[in-house]
Design a protein with these regions (language model features):
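Short amphipathic alpha-helical "recognition" segments used for binding
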Residues: 6-7, 210
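Bacterial N-terminal signal peptides
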Residues: 8-18
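Noncatalytic, solvent-exposed loop/strand surfaces
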Residues: 21-440
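N-terminal secretory signal peptides that target proteins for export/translocation
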Residues: 1-4
Length: 440
């Protein structure tokens, strides 16, 4: 059966349980393995704005949200620069034509950000779009609205200096949403007076109803209360867990009940009150990798036990060239750590933290997008829209460069699905494929 036929069959089976993602899909922010990697092969080795371009679809505005891909559909969150409205888009993966477009509320501006930053998620039948306004929409693949929720109305305002940016997680039949936010709702002039607590929430993806809500308590005070990281699953310690990172702690929660099983808080011993967290955890080799704020060290953890864990759970640390915003990549048994401001990539042995190699990627802009691992390569993109392709493995090598945009603030991570690359710039979504030919 063709990929298109498989997708149509999934739609026809709308009353059944969710279908499993194949290696050719990219269903949520960090991909099918939740670590930025995919088993995709046959991707184009060289490309540009005119070379190996299958299609290039203009977008109504910028966003840090990563496109998600299932079969012949691409789902994209955006903002319309002309109307300042938030949008949910469905694009045909074969042609680049817009299948449907839905308005999803009013945008709010935040410093260097907008409310379309969280990435959508899909299971092949439903696409869930979440926004920094805390509005969540579930659409079927035809674009019909199944349900919507206003989490600010139900669970309080998300007060973060740069606007809420955490992406939802679909895992084992639940949709997880995390709000690691400042307790003072009106701190940045965007919310009502009063205080509200951070939380981890599980909802029924079919109905949108809350299954449980777990308070995410912390003694952090100041901007350090805020985190832009996303929840990540972890199969460790004898069961399925959801990892939540920010507000001075990494916590592991029972995926079924939300109960906090353990927490570790060793990355901010001086209690610096502006150390907000942006990168999400990465899991690999039975370890959890977390990246401290503002280029402070990263840590590899073995979180065994319960309650408050001490630093005996730290397997190793690395602090020379580490990110502030981008999330690291676990790919083919290696850990790739971007220093997003210095534009340096380091390849580490994930078991020991020993550097295998390090390479300067160059370019004139910082990197905020997280790297992709696919087809034996590492794909990075800086804020100016320049893509840098590195060889994965034992030797550092830059394989290709491509200027894909003329505008700054390109922050969406590159994804691979169905033998193609999807690159979102400030103004366009590119679909790149081998032998697609030149584009005028």
């Amino acid at each position: 059966m063709t990929r298109r036929g498989t997708f149509i069959l999934c739609v026809a089976l709308a009353g059944l349980s969710p279908v499993a993602a194949s290696a050719a899909d990219w269903p949520q922010w960090r991909g099918p393995a939740f670590n930025g990697s995919t088993a995709e092969t046959g991707l184009p080795e060289k490309f540009s704005r005119t070379e190996n371009v299958l299609w290039a679809t203009p977008l109504p505005g910028p966003s840090g949200a990563t496109p998600v891909v299932w079969g012949d559909r691409v789902f994209v969150s955006s903002v319309d620069e002309k109307t300042n409205r938030l949008l949910a888009l469905c694009i045909d993966a074969a042609t680049g034509s817009v299948v449907w477009k839905k308005e999803t509320g009013q945008n709010r501006q935040a410093p260097r950000n907008n409310m379309a930053s969280p990435s959508p998620v899909t299971d092949g039948r439903t696409a869930w779009f979440f926004y920094g306004t805390a509005l969540l929409f579930a659409f079927d693949v035809r674009g019909d609205l199944l349900w919507s929720r206003d989490f600010e109305k139900d669970h309080g305002h998300n007060a973060l200096m740069f606007g809420y940016s955490s992406s939802p997680l679909l895992y084992k039949g639940k949709l997880y949403i995390v709000a690691i936010r400042n307790r003072q709702q009106d701190l940045y002039g965007r919310g009502p007076p009063g205080q509200t607590d951070p939380y981890l929430l599980a909802i029924d993806p079919k109905t949108g109803k809350d299954l449980w809500k777990q308070p995410r308590v912390s003694d952090a005070r100041g901007e350090v209360e805020e985190a832009y990281s996303s929840p990540i699953p972890y199969e460790g310690g004898g069961g399925s867990q959801i990892l939540v990172f920010g507000a001075d702690y990494l916590t592991g929660h029972d995926a079924e009940t939300g109960k906090e099983l353990w927490r570790w808080g060793g990355y901010n011993p001086r209690r610096i009150n502006h150390w907000r967290i942006i990168p999400s955890p990465v899991v690999g080799d039975d370890l959890v990798f977390v990246f401290g704020p503002k280029h402070s060290p990263m840590y590899a953890l073995r979180p065994k036990g319960s309650g408050l864990l001490d630093n005996s759970c730290v397997a190793w640390t690395f602090g020379k060239t580490v990110p502030d915003a981008a999330t690291g990549l676990y790919y083919q048994g290696m850990l790739y750590v971007p220093d997003d401001d210095r534009r340096v990539m380091t390849c580490l042995d994930p078991k020991t933290g020993t550097p295998k190699w390090q390479i300067e990627m160059g370019g004139s802009q910082v990197i905020r997008a997280s790297p992709l691992g696919a087809d034996g390569r590492i794909y990075c993109m800086n804020e100016g829209g320049e893509v840098i392709v590195l060889a994965s493995g034992d030797e550092p090598k830059i394989l290709h460069r491509a200027e894909m945009s003329d505008r700054e603030l390109t922050r969406s991570s590159i994804v691979a699905a169905g033998g193609r690359l999807f690159i979102r710039t400030t103004e366009k979504l590119y679909c790149l494929a081998r032998a697609a030919g030149p584009r005028s």
